[in-house]
From Swiss-Prot:
This is Methionyl-tRNA formyltransferase. Belongs to the Fmt family. Keywords: Protein biosynthesis, Transferase. The gene is fmt. One of its GO terms (cellular component) is cytosol. One of its GO terms (molecular function) is methionyl-tRNA formyltransferase activity. (6S)-5,6,7,8-tetrahydrofolate binds at S113, L114, L115, P116. The lineage of its organism: Bacteria, Pseudomonadati, Pseudomonadota, Gammaproteobacteria, Enterobacterales. It catalyses: L-methionyl-tRNA(fMet) + (6R)-10-formyltetrahydrofolate = N-formyl-L-methionyl-tRNA(fMet) + (6S)-5,6,7,8-tetrahydrofolate + H(+). Signal peptide: none annotated. InterPro entries: Fmt (IPR005794), Formyl_trans_C (IPR005793), Formyl_trans_C_sf (IPR037022), Formyl_transf_N (IPR002376), Formyl_transf_N_sf (IPR036477), Formyl_transferase-like_C_sf (IPR011034), GART_AS (IPR001555), Met-tRNA-FMT_C (IPR044135). Attaches a formyl group to the free amino group of methionyl-tRNA(fMet). The formyl group appears to play a dual role in the initiator identity of N-formylmethionyl-tRNA by promoting its recognition by IF2 and preventing the misappropriation of this tRNA by the elongation apparatus. Its EC number is 2.1.2.9.
Amino acid sequence: MSESLRIIFAGTPDFAARHLDALLSSGHNVVGVFTQPDRPAGRGKKLMPSPVKVLAEEKGLPVFQPVSLRPQENQQLVADLQADVMVVVAYGLILPKAVLEMPRLGCINVHGSLLPRWRGAAPIQRSLWAGDAETGVTIMQMDVGLDTGDMLYKLSSPITAEDTSGTLYDKLAELGPQGLITTLKQLADGTAKPEVQDETLVTYAEKLSKEEARIDWSLSAAQLERCIRAFNPWPMSWLEIEGQPVKVWKASVIDTVTKSAPGTILEASKQGIQVATGDGILNLLSLQPAGKKAMSAQDLLNSRREWFVPGNRLA
């Protein structure tokens, strides 16, 4: 086996916890875990630990939860662990240059795209939103830029017509640990081959917002269908009817030319609610009114047919 490395792990959500779990089974020595401070969650706004903290405490690992790594005393926490490498997965804090240079082999990051495409905060969602044929994970050496470091290892996965951000998240949460363990072996053996990112191929994955997820009927049906999958499970595509938000869980594209204005309801039946768009027809299949569970178009029509009268326009 390769040399056992002393590793600091830094991460916060479930996606990161799956990588920590793989590390703990890999024969390497996780000497400390950094994660975001506990946050209020749920209706009672009770302070809740991150999935990474829960796993780390189960395994008896030292856990550190600084609000920032800029203060000298917090940087000293990293230095005192004398790590060979720091593994960063969806941590959520900026690592100052001093921290990046502390481990012997530096800091590496698992990023949810095939860099240099989709640097930034929402790579999984943006790959769907843009209609990419594939996505994947990139293990990269971290530097002070935003996802600009040299690439150490990549694994790809096709994007299917049924994928949502939720299903892609799960696929990449399986791929990421595989790539991470392989990269650590190469770093330990001295066989890693860093590859500089091609700046001419860079795209940026901007954060999602609830406002962006509001359905814009002037877009094409194909674009809107991709948005619905990209924004599932958050923030969820939505439209407004009688002042109420209605989430859209699933839709399909009907590739038919229509002269009706975008947003016009063309047909409402058990096969779906057909709406004119800027190009083509979007067939709404599964919706969720405020305060209700998601339901089929048929079930919603049974209770709210007046919302979907053909000829009316959706805002």
